[in-house]
């Protein structure tokens, strides 16, 4: 995340071209959906907490990055059981699906945030367009970096004791277990609180503007 180019947008915060997503995908592909998703979400969330521009978005960042790492890990675990070209193609697919999920959640959050603070629908949509381009660049870079790295690292780590803690062992295939249910509830709660915060902020701004006008 610290290797980045910030791009100002007409309304709202800024958008960035960076390499952070590649590490989030790599975490999912190496460690599986649970551990990889948490590593992705916690790492990205901590970055936002230490950046004044993004500190308010940190909880939502955790949720969206967790989703990216979780999906990449879920599909990647099945892919690494295969061999040859089939494995490579499925690992690429895992990375692409993880990135698409994140892009959707990120753009949705950006649009909803602008709407909640009183931005007109068309203006909010126009403000999101530059983020689509930046997100696409980030996604392509993330897949290009994380896929070969994950394959190479798994091969190297297979010769070490560390390999035993990766996602190669048999795991509980019932994904609707207490952990995933709790994380889902947490993500929904964070999203609701974030929306309520923005709504309250917009109300305060509207009241202040009314006082100024009168």
Give the residues covered by each predicted segment.
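Loop-helix junctions at membrane interfaces
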Residues: 1-214
């Amino acid at each position: 995340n610290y290797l980045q180019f910030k791009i100002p947008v007409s309304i709202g915060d800024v958008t960035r071209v960076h390499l952070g997503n590649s590490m989030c995908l790599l975490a999912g592909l190496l460690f599986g959906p649970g551990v990889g998703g948490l590593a992705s979400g916690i790492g990205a969330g901590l970055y936002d907490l230490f950046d004044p521009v993004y500190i308010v978005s940190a909880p939502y960042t955790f949720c969206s990055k967790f989703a990216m790492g979780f999906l990449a890990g879920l599909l990647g675990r099945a892919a690494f059981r295969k061999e040859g070209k089939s494995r490579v193609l499925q690992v690429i697919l895992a990375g692409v699906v993880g990135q698409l999920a994140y892009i959707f959640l990120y753009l949705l959050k950006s649009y909803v945030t602008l709407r909640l603070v009183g931005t007109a629908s068309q203006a909010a949509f126009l403000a999101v367009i530059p983020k689509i381009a930046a997100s696409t660049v980030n996604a392509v870079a993330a897949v290009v970096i994380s896929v070969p790295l994950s394959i190479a690292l798994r091969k190297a780590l297979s010769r070490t004791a560390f390999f035993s803690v990766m996602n190669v062992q048999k795991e509980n295939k019932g994904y609707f277990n207490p952990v995933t249910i709790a994380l889902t509830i947490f993500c929904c709660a964070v999203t609701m609180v974030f929306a309520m915060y923005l709504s309250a902020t917009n109300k305060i701004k509207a009241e202040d503007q009314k006082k100024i006008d009168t």
